[in-house]
Regions:
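FAD-dinucleotide binding site
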Residues: 1-436
Length: 436
């Protein structure tokens, strides 16, 4: 059995950050990764000479962002694309009404103003909500207080429903009232024309990463931890919530009640990307996104123009929440037909068949079991930190679901890896030493 100071399970951003900081502090570390690549849910497809991020895409706000700092240090080019947080405005967005016609500037401004008004009203309603309240509950309370006509309320309600689905891949009634508390964008959002996976590969440089090494059992005790083939003084586990909750990954002895209860109040979402490349552009020029209002947008309601990144006319949409589950198992061609039918409702017969279709399948990935975690009703933001509380001075959990301030992001993964490394060491190391 090979012995090291620390075993890190998972070569995603959390695991790689923790490992890099520990190695920098002089510790012996092995990173065990089940996949044949590093990055975890940061995964870039480079087939046919194109760059497509299948997992994480955005830095959601570059102001005071450690991920942005790392990207700069690693020489990763970025492109500003500030619509990833489902903002109602700020960048050009073509809104289409329930009748399939584009809203004019005045109608768009009125709709956006209503969304902003409700968002402002939501804050105090959420703050005073019951522990088991859902985002649906607080939305309805805030809407009722506005006294708007039914159709006006319906459009804003619909926007919040779609935002919940696009931000967390879950229906609004299944998300805790506090589930979007950290959905705040500070500064521009950016994407990576050369792929987000450059962050993972850069963090992995110089580390002892064992690919194709599936860990299904972690044994820990006061004197250390073992996994098949390895022993260590401490272990950092960075597998996603969906894996932690599965029978295929066992921690013995089990997690203490505090961590186990926090874990039980989180769930992995259903959230898939659909990338469509077309022979020519047919949608509105000079817009970042196209959005469909009204009941026809129940499935496909938002498309993001990736042409600047791709070099060919390209739209990105999402199968989120119930839609992702409904199309699970569909062929990419069938998904494309469904999406294209909706686009033709907006743009008519000029919409051609796509020349290329990519549909992700994170729900079916045994090492992810979804895209990222969300807070169920009854959960609190404290659950993220409770999950990360060190166990016995030996076992440490890290990953996007263990960071309170900005969960479900690469930022959360990076910071959680830093926190785990500091807990292992027993002192604080600068996070920037992971890339400087």
């Amino acid at each position: 059995m090979e012995h090291v100071d620390t075993i890190v399970i998972g070569a995603g951003i959390a695991g790689l950050t923790a490992a890099r900081l520990l190695v920098g502090a002089g510790r012996g570390v092995v990173v065990l990764e089940a996949r044949d690549r590093v990055g975890g849910r940061v995964h870039t497809d480079r087939s046919e000479g194109r760059v497509t991020d299948l997992g994480a895409s955005w830095i959601h706000g570059v102001e005071d962002s450690r991920v942005a700092d790392a990207a700069i240090a690693f020489g990763m080019p970025v492109v500003e694309f500030t619509v990833g947080g489902y903002q109602p405005d700020g960048r050009p967005i073509a809104y289409f009404g329930a009748d399939g016609r584009r809203l004019d500037a005045d109608a768009t401004a009125r709709f956006v103003a209503d969304v902003r008004t409700l968002d402002a009203a939501l804050g105090p309603v959420i703050a005073g909500s019951a522990p088991d309240a859902t985002y649906r509950d607080v939305t309805e309370t805030a809407l009722a207080a506005q006294g708007w006509p039914a159709d006006r309320s319906a459009r804003v309600r619909e926007h919040l429903e779609h935002r919940s689905e696009e931000q967390y891949g879950v229906r609004i009634e299944d998300l805790a009232a506090h589930g979007l508390d950290d959905d705040v964008i500070a500064g521009d959002e950016v994407v990576f024309p050369d792929g987000y996976d450059r962050l993972a590969s850069s963090l992995a440089e110089g580390l002892d990463v064992r690919l194709g090494h599936v860990v299904s059992r972690v044994m820990w005790a006061p004197e250390g931890a073992t996994v098949p083939g390895f022993s260590a003084d401490q272990v950092v586990v960075t597998v996603p919530v969906g894996v932690l909750q599965s029978d295929d990954f066992v921690i013995e002895p089990p997690l203490p009640d505090r961590q186990r209860d926090a874990l039980a109040r989180l769930r992995m979402n259903a959230f898939e990307k659909v990338v469509l490349r077309f022979p020519h552009r047919f949608w509105d020029a000079d817009v970042h996104a196209v959005r469909q209002l009204g009941p026809h947008g129940a499935w496909w309601h938002s498309w993001y123009d990736l042409t600047r990144l791709d070099g060919v006319p390209t739209l990105l949409t999402f199968a989120a929440g119930p839609v992702a589950r409904a199309v699970r198992g569909w062929t990419p061609e069938r998904v494309a037909e469904s999406v294209t039918a909706q686009l033709r409702r907006l743009y008519g017969a000029q919409v051609p068949d796509p020349t290329d279709v990519i549909v992700t399948a994170w729900q079916d990935d045994p090492f992810a079991r979804g895209s990222y975690a969300y807070m169920m009703p009854g959960s609190t933001t404290r659950d993220h930190d409770d999950l990360a509380e060190p166990v016995g001075g030996v076992l440490h959990l890290a990953g996007e679901a263990t960071w309170t301030d900005d969960p479900a992001t690469v930022t959360a993964a990076l910071h959680s890896g830093h926190r785990a490394a500091c807990a292992v060491l027993g002192w604080t190391v600068p996070i920037a030493s992971a890339w400087s």
